[in-house]
Amino acid sequence: MEDKILKDVLQVLLDNKADDIVYLNVTSFNPLAEFFVICTVSSNRQAMALANYVDDVLSKNGIKVKHIEGNSTSEWILVDGIDYIVHIFVKEARIRYGLEKMWSDLPIIKVG
């Protein structure tokens, strides 16, 4: 992996105890984004905190976050960093929505 911003995003997720972290290069599937990152956390509160950490990392790398969808009671928080879309789920929601299945024709890279 050569993308510094992606590395920084993945590192902040690892440092803050996200589980089951994967990423996909979606440029062939979605011309509006480069990477989708998906991870699992143990609580809604942890999800919101991680969303804020990801926002900070992207901002420090010159990426303006377009939107953070969700709040401290959400089971799924999406951080829209334009080229870097980060999906943060509590476990039950990740299973229920099964996002990885939607992109099953793309390589899914596991982290950690």
What are these regions (language model features)?
Residues 30, 74-75, 95:
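Short secondary-structure capping/turn micro-motifs that flank functional sites
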Residues 1-52, 56-66, 107-112:
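Ribosome large-subunit tunnel/peptidyl-transferase-proximal elements
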Residues 57-89:
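Mid-chain, well-packed structural core segment of small domains
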